[in-house]
């Protein structure tokens, strides 16, 4: 009901139960109304059906004429009625409706009499029909149409009303106009195969009054089956098979409420009177219960809803549990108590009085009770299973049941079914009344069992064609041959949906107190776990107890009665010891983990936290320098801005960026249980010709036909195939999952968010494509496959070392783009900081490399080819060393949705930092589940900063605004200009578990991070002073054979802080919250874990104290052949040029020694190349002073096409600034050191030319100038070098512009007049 519903506050209509009352009260009224309506209809129809009881008294008469062949006689009418009334609950299992039906206005007119005042005309039987009941046969379960309502309203009570609408339940479709008798007989074989076309949500309770039904059930069924033709076919067969059940219920209950069978009519009248009283009491906020309506009690009703939309079922059109008012709750409680008492006694008396005409009456309750014993969810998954198994039992030689279609299968009385089945209702507690009734019933079961068998042995000869059954029913078909087997099958199917016993700590009350015969096991309350759907709360427990239950099976006789798709092979009494331990152990283990987590993180040192005042919070570098020495021992600190500093985060929701896909379970060690099983699956798929590079993704769409696992924009969640396979096996296999429609449950267990579009269909598709063939392998094949994968892994590690140390050539593409600044060569900045793979230059470069290094790289090429061949041979293990993959381009809005869905996968509510931290390290260390999250780094130069940048916006010029910080006068990086990833801030966009692995900035630069918005971030830090110890510890922990530990750590490896602390390394921890700064100091090793969706912004800065550390870091990167984001040579020369004019003696004194060392190395290498025979050299500048600008423009600009990234040395990735050696024809660049190695090796300098920016005189002049100003106070000159010292000459502003240089063709020797000035 919507919130606006109460506006229609019109309550004067006494019987209009839809207006002006709360939903909860409306459902209560509906239930009681329905009881009264059913009795009212029964009392009137009884006059038309007086002959039914007499005909059904014979043991065979009603079975042969009324139930089995009822389609050819009036008895079918009776069965149809009985089915519609008593079989309402039966629909809950077999009905096809999947969705909760909506309430339509037309339900008020679907059947006027039951929902109308007493003056409503009574619909009389058509006198032209053969019997007073024949017209009821034409009732359909199809949903009535509006036109039919109008026809019915206009013509009701008149002979003009069509016979098929006499009781209004079907439209005049061609399917409904067919003879119902012929339909039933022709379509009976399809009952079992089509019984699970859909999954009803809730069940409808039995309305057993007198064995006659107010044309309810069959009409209801036909309506529900309208959308599906197969479901239509099954409805007829179900109607036919259900008549016996309802008839049996009605007559047995009649016997229980009357002295003998001859007084049934009087009992019906008394029941009618009581029900009328009941309606009147409910209208007066009181509620009673009649003897004959125990099955429609409130407690029974509240857990079920009927999918039908007509008014006949308004008493049960509800979903979920009824929320009663206090007064009504008490009344309903009394009604339930009365129903329970009457039901227990009536069931026993009915059994003793009516067992002799089982052929007709004792079968009326058939399958209805068990469906009511559990909630609609359990019924929906068991709809097909129970229908087919029971049908096969009844049709094929069952001897204990009274029905041929398997509805009873050994149920000996209507009350027996009710009492036995009630305790296993899903999601509800078992009351003491039901337990007592069920115990009382057990005493009668044994004494009456033999008589029931004798009277039902003739049933198996009935004329019903067997229907083609599913796999499970086929097996049951061949096994249910004897009375023992039949009764066992009855208990199997009866208990198919009792999740409480399966997941609870102990089985609910059951009849073991009463002695049971060998053919009737004492486990009617013991569920068959494979065929039941547990409560939502217990859904997660199923996977942990399936295997334990399967191992506990020891009874082969009972096992033979199970189906091939059954998940559990045992029908022994439930062993509660198998159920609670997994859950208890898991809870205890979680608690122990929490305690360990608290202890481990308490051992970590906390970082300093500073809270500057508004006055101190002005210049960040000045403020940080005040406590720099104190904090460097921790590696980082946290700064809490003043309360009045809160800039608004302004980001474009539609900005797009490329994400990283992080496999969290592989961030520690690459190999684990989950990865191993996934490798086995991939290896098996490869043998089948199926390639699977990554796990499939459930979401909006798939991208490729073979893999279909590209990153999905909305709801993209990678499927854990290894766990998926285990869950399917735990649920009984693919066939069991398909039969019981457990895909939704599987999706919930896999924690796939419901917002993912078509998650169930794609989950099923993923299983069929990737897992079905694997799960069909025998245990021997699985073991062999696992051994082969382990052998491959061990062989791979023997060749290349641990997986964590394997190189990944594509790791640069996952890092933050590093851009080359505009340094004067061509005025261009590179787009992504790495080689721009244009087609033509790439081809030329590759060709030049082949020609230049044909001899030198011959051995290396052979090794590379061998490595490629090895990786091809490795097959499924070729990428096991990877844990971070490139994602797809998404918008910020889409990323937020993915982050939200990911959070829902792992946490039910917003978690705290400690909870995320605990689960994160459990995933990393245990590696038993597949966890993939996304992470993004975005350049603010392209997409904009989160800080205000407008001149008029507040905080746009504040010193702590990270877009302003790079230009701070105290930061020496300002001399570099705009370098994305260094002096241009970048955004870090993460979600829960998004990780920045242990790392140290490659240039040892400090940086500041500000958390704009979102969840907390957990930071860990190791100070720079722990570097040596950390290298040894990591080398030992990762078993790095010859690989330095720090290099291993840089390959995206996460090691728990607890482990590092045990090894004696100081680790500090802090939690950054929104609006706080984290400052990381030079050389510190840090890692970060996001606790949810968050957006932070980071930028580097550097003070003069960093220069020595940065210079050593640059030399280390060159030796390790790692590309640097900027040139250290350029930074030194730019600082020297700018600070010499400002006479900043502090900075000059810091860089003077570094500048001298750089000059000495440069001059030495130039001299060595000259001596090795490299005589050709040229200087690149803006233009040659001996030529006019016009002549310069006419010359071909050969090097202008080369972008900045091409000036990296092709050997060591060193960014050449002062000089380089080029191969003119092939555009290949060397640094001086690598060029010297090449010339010495090949003894040939053909085609090589050295290009230099500054000549020797200029370099010496700049070094002397810097040294002189740095030591002016002491009055001494100690800037000694290999080159003569000359005073710097004055240079005009025009020559100062020569720093902006473009590459042009140069003469072989530099012009003597081209003396560019350096200022």
Swiss-Prot record:
Record field: compositional bias (Basic residues): 1-11, 98-107
Region ranges (Disordered): 1-23, 50-130, 173-265, 351-382, 396-478, 499-537, 549-599, 798-818
Chain ranges of the JmjN domain: 607-648
Stated role: Regulator of histone methyltransferase complexes that plays an essential role in embryonic development. Acts by modulating histone methyltransferase activity and promoting the recruitment of histone methyltransferase complexes to their target genes. Binds DNA and mediates the recruitment of the PRC2 complex to target genes in embryonic stem cells. Does not have histone demethylase activity but regulates activity of various histone methyltransferase complexes.
Record note on quaternary structure: Associates with the PRC2 complex.
Domain comment as written in the entry: The ARID domain is required to target the PRC2 complex to its target genes.
Family in the record: Belongs to the JARID2 family.
Protein name as annotated: Protein Jumonji
Species, as recorded: Danio rerio (Zebrafish)
